[in-house]
């Protein structure tokens, strides 16, 4: 019997790229309206589950703060934090997930950096 070797990085990348194609909930970008609300200070992000992160976890004012969104491509958290004033870098293993962030940034005039790498 031959051992099957699975490359976890390649497997993860392919899975998340497919999720984007399928419209998975973690791959659906935020709306332009969500971005506009974030610009006005009315924002929230969800990291796991369905409940927004407690705002006390983050500074009251994100203006100029450096934020690393690790393994969080998909056009959700990074764009919202960028709209709230943070300098955002989104690091993810999926080119398509990062593409969602890039699409929102271009659509809504946001500055954020995306970095592709294994996670």
Please place each PLM-identified region on the residue numbering.
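Conserved N-terminal segment of class I S-adenosyl-L-methionine
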Residues: 14, 21, 53, 66, ...
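N-terminal, positively charged/glycine-rich alpha-helical extensions of SAM-dependent methyltransferases
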Residues: 1-37
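Class I SAM-dependent methyltransferase SAM/SAH-binding core
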Residues: 65-119
